Amino acid sequence: MKQHIAIIIALCMVACNTNKSTDALLVEVWNNDQSAREQMVELTRAVTIEGRTDLIDSLIAGVEAVEKVDIKNISIIDSLLRDGLPENLTPQSYKTIWIVIDHASLDKQEQYLPLIEEMSQNGLIGKDEHAILYDRIAMKRNCPQRYGSQTVQFGKPDAMNLYVYPVENPALLDSLRASVGMSSMEEYLKQLTKTTGIEAKYDAELTIEQLEAMRGIFK
């Protein structure tokens, strides 16, 4: 009996150590993801809002750096999820798994969308995080999004535009957003405008074709 108890305790200690190791790895993954993006956002703002054309090469390098980080991070998540979703990780670790998938290529996003939905249903991540991934996939497929979380930015440095990507059911948009814990579209637009420094716009009647035509003018 004592031997059995000792074995159980030993196994628990191994599991705890494994979880701590995984959590530590995912902290590093999160930091790499955020650090690369923060630098790119600062450069993007400088070029597009402040007109710092002298930083264009730095911005291009920043975009490439983000892409490299994303590729490395999703390979780590692939390995981590090979035998299924680890249990008993910290909330931040589960959020990191989501954000790496959210920043991955379309095929990886589609591959893991069912897992992300399951994680949100089980309370490991927020329902809004599943909604964001769902919308991102829809936009990449050139389809209307459901929750209005995705935006597109285009224009010239002194005249940038920021539009919410078209949604599939404008009449139900705010109720759909509320169902996953998102703010109203009105509040979201205020938040976007404050964060980006660009007036965020939402046109319920705007189609994908019309939006692409608007973007094409600046290409």
Region locations from a protein language model:
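Short beta-strand and adjacent turn/loop elements
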Residues: 69-74, 78-219
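Generic N-terminal initiation segments characterized by hydrophobic and/or small/turn-forming residues
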Residues: 8-10, 22-23
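Start-of-domain marker
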Residues: 17-86
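A periodicity- and composition-biased signal for non-globular, repetitive helical segments
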Residues: 8-9, 43, 183
